[in-house]
């Protein structure tokens, strides 16, 4: 199956989904949807991304619109809770209640070690047996990362600290960090992979222990599976804050990975006031299926005509950068 630019633009819908809590600094998630022979697809690069960085996101959406995938290894995916950079104990407890049955929590950190320790301690107070992941988004310098990871491990997390996601920005920094860390903590790589011009060319040895796979920024399910096979590391499938349409593509990726040892970060739909479809979390897991999009919600959350035109122009510009265009 294939799809043309004209077909994409003809079926294009843009929605603005309000969030229950700020995440990544935003309270409204704007995203574009279009239809192909295989159903709805999502194109959702954040608005600040330049056109070239958006190309793999468009390739993933085209794949979703034109390809039918069967569940290969599992029909349900264990997921983690996600706690934004909030220090309010009541809010943290409320956020965790949106993820029934999860036994793993990903916590955004990097706002300051004092605040980070408080946030992690509050999560552990509410879910004392949960595995903890912290996500730094590459914001620490090496010296800070060494100190902060040792401190977090020693004071609040201990062996419950499953891994630290992208603590520093570059591969060289990640290698140096692993050499200097005294505590036995795994390091996961996210931005270092998905922001690389050629992620297949990266030498990840001695730099990371876990590979984060985000289906849209990596160009789709097929390319993500190829990357996982190439780098031969344990993987976690995670979201890029998509609606249920994009999340379902991530769930299909997770179902296609033979060995999946970690809970996946695909439950971020819980952060929306309402999603375009219902993807429930049951006993800490989500089912792999094609969501039924609610037409009423498509209308209710429709973006303004000006924003629709902005996305039309964006898709047209990105389409021209595709290698097959």
Residue ranges and their predicted role:
Residues 107-110, 114-249, 254, 273-281:
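Catalytic core of soluble alpha/beta enzymes
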Residues 74-77, 101-102, 128-129, 183-184, ...:
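Short coil/turn connectors at secondary-structure junctions
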Residues 17-24, 76-90, 108-110, 138-142, ...:
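Active-site mouth loops of central-metabolism enzymes
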Residues 65-68, 81-97, 110, 117-122:
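Short, charged beta->alpha transition segments
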Residues 30-35:
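Short beta-strand elements
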Residues 41-89:
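Mid-domain alpha/beta scaffold segments of enzyme catalytic cores
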């Amino acid at each position: 199956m294939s799809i043309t630019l004209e077909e994409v633009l003809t079926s294009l819908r843009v929605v603005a989904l309000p969030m229950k809590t700020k995440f990544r600094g935003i309270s409204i998630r704007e995203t574009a949807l279009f239809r192909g022979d295989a159903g709805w697809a999502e194109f959702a690069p954040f608005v600040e991304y330049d056109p070239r960085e958006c190309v793999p996101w468009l390739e993933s959406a085209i794949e979703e619109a034109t390809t039918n995938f069967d569940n290969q290894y599992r029909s349900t995916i264990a997921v983690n809770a996600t706690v934004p950079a909030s220090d309010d104990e009541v809010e943290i407890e409320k956020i965790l209640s949106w993820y029934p049955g999860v036994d793993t929590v990903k916590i955004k950190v990097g706002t300051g070690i004092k605040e980070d320790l408080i946030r992690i301690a509050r999560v552990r107070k509410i879910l004392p047996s949960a595995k903890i992941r912290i996500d730094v988004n590459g914001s620490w310098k090496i010296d800070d990362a060494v100190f902060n990871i040792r401190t977090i491990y020693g004071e609040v997390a201990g062996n419950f600290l499953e891994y630290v996601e992208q603590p520093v920005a570059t591969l060289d920094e990640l290698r140096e960090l692993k050499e200097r860390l005294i505590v036995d903590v795994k390091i996961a790589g996210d931005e270092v992979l998905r922001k690389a011009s050629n992620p297949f060319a990266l030498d990840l040895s001695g730099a990371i222990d876990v590979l984060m796979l985000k289906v849209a920024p990596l160009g789709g399910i097929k390319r993500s599976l190829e990357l996982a096979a190439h780098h031969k590391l344990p993987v976690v499938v995670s979201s890029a804050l998509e609606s249920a349409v994009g999340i379902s593509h991530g769930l299909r990726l997770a179902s296609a990975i033979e060995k999946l040892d970690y809970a996946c970060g695909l439950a971020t739909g819980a952060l929306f006031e309402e999603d375009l479809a219902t993807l429930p979390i049951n006993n800490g897991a989500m089912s792999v299926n094609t969501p039924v999009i609610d037409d009423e919600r498509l209308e209710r959350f429709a973006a303004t005509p000006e924003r629709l035109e902005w996305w039309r122009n964006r898709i047209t510009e990105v389409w021209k950068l595709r290698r097959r265009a």
